[in-house]
């Protein structure tokens, strides 16, 4: 099929009815005149017919169709645009079928006269008739966009020059032409590629570390440890499983050791490690009490690339605003985290996490500190989450620190108009009465005439640094004394031993002050200012008695006895001591 390459030409101009073919001598030039075209590429024909040059050419827009009869050596091109359409044709025309022969029309006139041809190859139209202009502006634009380098190339033995359309299959000449175009285009593409800077791809598909399971991050430069968990691999799946991130490390060796520990946890001691198994004996024993996820999480927390605000303790994070430490435990409230509170130190937050872990996960819980540090039984039996001191194991259970021991004096004298209220507080624990510290100084003062002054009344408080510290840290520094009317003089002992007579009107004294109510005689009672803290109460049962006069303030017991003594006319002893406790 490639060898059958003849041209089939036809004219785009109006056709005549005359249809003939004539073979002429080589000395006679065949002239083909377009009888209707008056313009050839916007060139007007001369108006004088006598001087008109009859130029032999095929129609200016001759579109040829190959009839598959041309040999392989013929020159053909796709959309061949020949600029010499109006050139002088001196070669013999190759006889071939024309489209006009099939359509029954002709556009050629044969003349035996000599033909005058312009040196530039311009053609003169023999007739100035209209109808030859077919969008010349559009054709000129098309020609300018599709010009061919070899415009003067002529086909061998082919006198037809014009706009040619090749409809043949691929020939050797056209293949050569196309190959040349491909070479030019390929060369251009290569030039563009060579001028473009090449982007180097580092370590793609290559090992970036000599250790197993370690890769170097291209951007950060840190070494990351990864492990492929094939336990979640489904049947028929070609992937290695799920990639487990073990943390980022500054040193390559640390990342390799993290991989070794994770591999030992996942696959046992038979797996391949970067370092000898003898170096991980301690870690192998520790990881037996942890799940895979928990152990991987512990490895991540120890890595240098752990998240911002992380703590070395499990379940502890730092708040990004106020900087306090928060404790959370996961997977206990459905699939969400349970917030445990905010704490001042990491250790407190870590203890809160440990207590919650023991509560929700029992004895198999993974804690930050040793489980013997906590009262596990109390935590497990508690209906709520006992975060705080109540969940800790108290080493000195027999030595709790109570808040305060207070005792009062009750007047049993017949001359007593207003007496003390006998008040008692009972605590749930009964322990021996003991004294923490003794005061060496005695404080003397007295009350006279109902007014305190530097002249008639002298209240002497010898302030020491320890006493001031105690008073500042006491829950209450002052106790009010109610106003009471009395028909006799009162004797009030403040901070020591006092002999005084006067009408009592009432005033405020510090907590821990010993008060002796004696209407007739004086009493000397030893007092120590810091006998405030005791471990237990002395009496298990105490009565609350109300005297007709009203209530008097309570006072702290001295260091010599468990009771406050009252000295009056009838003589007698006051009420037993009592204590006030709190759970702090």
From Swiss-Prot:
BP terms from Gene Ontology: cell population proliferation
Keyword Lipid metabolism: no
Tissue expression summary: Mostly expressed in developing seeds. Also expressed in roots, seedlings, and siliques, and, at low levels, in leaves.
DNA-binding region: 210-276, 312-370
Keyword Nucleus assigned: yes
Gene Ontology CC, one term: nucleus
Domain of life: Eukaryota
Keywords: Developmental protein, DNA-binding, Nucleus, Repeat, Transcription, Transcription regulation
GO molecular function: DNA binding; DNA-binding transcription factor activity
UniProt main location, coarse: nucleus
SUPFAM superfamilies tied to this protein: DNA-binding domain
SMART domains, per the entry: AP2 (SM00380)
Compartment annotation: Nucleus
Region of interest (Disordered), ranges: 150-180
Compositionally biased tracts (Low complexity): 164-180
Transmembrane domains' residue ranges: none
InterPro entries according to UniProt: AP2/ERF_dom, AP2/ERF_dom_sf, DNA-bd_dom_sf
Additional remarks: Was named 'Baby boom' because overexpressing transgenic plants exhibit several spontaneous somatic embryos.
Record note on quaternary structure: Interacts with HDG1, HDG2, HDG3, HDG10, ANL2, ATML1, PDF2, HDG11 and HDG12.
Family classification: Belongs to the AP2/ERF transcription factor family. AP2 subfamily.
Function as written in the Swiss-Prot or TrEMBL entry: Transcription factor that, in opposition to HDG1, promotes cell proliferation and morphogenesis via transcriptional activation of meristem and cell proliferation genes, but prevents differentiation, especially during embryogenesis. Binds to the promoter and triggers the expression of epidermally expressed genes such as GSO1, GSO2, ACR4 and WER, and of HD-ZIP homeobox genes including PDF2, HDG1, HDG5, HDG7, HDG8, HDG11, ANL2, PDF2 and ATML1.
The protein, known as: AP2-like ethylene-responsive transcription factor BBM
Gene, per the UniProt record: BBM
């Amino acid at each position: 099929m490639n060898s059958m390459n003849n041209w089939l030409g036809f004219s785009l101009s109006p056709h005549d009815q005359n249809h003939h073919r004539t073979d002429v001598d080589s000395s006679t030039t065949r002239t083909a005149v377009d009888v209707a075209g008056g313009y050839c590429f916007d060139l007007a024909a001369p108006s004088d017919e006598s001087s008109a040059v009859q130029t032999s050419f095929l129609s200016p827009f001759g579109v040829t169709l190959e009839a598959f009869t041309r040999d392989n050596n013929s020159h053909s091109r796709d959309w061949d645009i020949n600029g010499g359409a109006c050139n002088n044709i001196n070669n013999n025309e190759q006889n071939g079928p024309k489209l006009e022969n099939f359509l029954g029309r002709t556009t050629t006139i044969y003349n035996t006269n000599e033909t005058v041809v312009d040196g530039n190859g311009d053609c003169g139209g023999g007739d100035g008739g209209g109808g030859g202009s077919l969008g010349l502006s559009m054709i000129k634009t098309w020609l300018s966009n599709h010009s061919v380098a070899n415009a003067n190339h002529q086909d061998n033995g082919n006198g037809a020059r014009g706009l040619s359309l090749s409809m043949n299959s691929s020939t050797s000449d056209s293949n050569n032409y196309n190959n040349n175009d491909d070479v030019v285009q390929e060369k251009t593409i290569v030039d563009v590629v060579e001028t473009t800077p090449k982007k180097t791809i580092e370590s793609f598909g290559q090992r970036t570390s000599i250790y197993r399971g370690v890769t170097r991050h291209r951007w950060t430069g840190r070494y990351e440890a990864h492990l492929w968990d094939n336990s979640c691999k489904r049947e028929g799946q070609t992937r290695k499983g799920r990639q487990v991130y073990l943390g980022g490390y500054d040193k390559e060796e640390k990342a390799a050791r993290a991989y070794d520990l994770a591999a030992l946890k996942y696959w046992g001691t038979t797996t391949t490690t970067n370092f000898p198994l003898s170096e991980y004996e301690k870690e192998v024993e520790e990881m037996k009490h942890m799940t895979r996820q928990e152990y991987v999480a512990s490895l991540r927390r120890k890595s240098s690339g752990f998240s911002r605000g992380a703590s070395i303790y499990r379940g502890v994070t730092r708040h990004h605003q106020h900087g306090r430490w928060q404790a959370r435990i996961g997977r206990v409230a459905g699939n969400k985290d349970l917030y445990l509170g905010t704490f001042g130190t990491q250790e407190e937050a870590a203890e809160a996490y440990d207590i919650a872990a023991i509560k929700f996960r029992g004895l198999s819980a993974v804690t930050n500190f040793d489980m013997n540090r906590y009262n596990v039984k109390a935590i497990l039996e508690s209906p709520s989450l006992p975060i705080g001191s109540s969940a800790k194991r108290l080493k000195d259970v027999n030595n709790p620190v109570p808040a305060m021991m207070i005792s009062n004096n009750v007047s049993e004298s017949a001359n007593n108009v207003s007496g003390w209220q006998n008040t008692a507080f009972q605590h749930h624990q009964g322990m021996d009465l003991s004294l923490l510290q003794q005061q060496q100084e005695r404080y003397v003062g007295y009350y006279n005439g109902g007014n305190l002054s530097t002249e008639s009344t002298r209240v002497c408080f010898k302030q020491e640094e320890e006493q001031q510290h105690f008073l500042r840290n006491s829950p209450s520094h002052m106790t009010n004394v109610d106003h009471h009317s009395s028909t006799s003089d009162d004797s009030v002992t403040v901070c020591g031993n006092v002999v005084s007579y006067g009408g009592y009107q009432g005033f405020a004294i510090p907590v821990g002050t010993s008060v002796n109510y004696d209407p007739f005689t004086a009493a000397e009672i030893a007092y120590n200012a810091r006998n405030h803290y005791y471990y237990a109460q002395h009496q298990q049962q105490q009565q609350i008695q109300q005297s007709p006069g009203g209530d008097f303030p309570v006072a702290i017991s001295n260091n010599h006895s468990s009771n406050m003594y009252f000295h009056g006319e009838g003589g007698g002893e006051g009420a037993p001591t009592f204590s006030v406790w709190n759970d702090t």
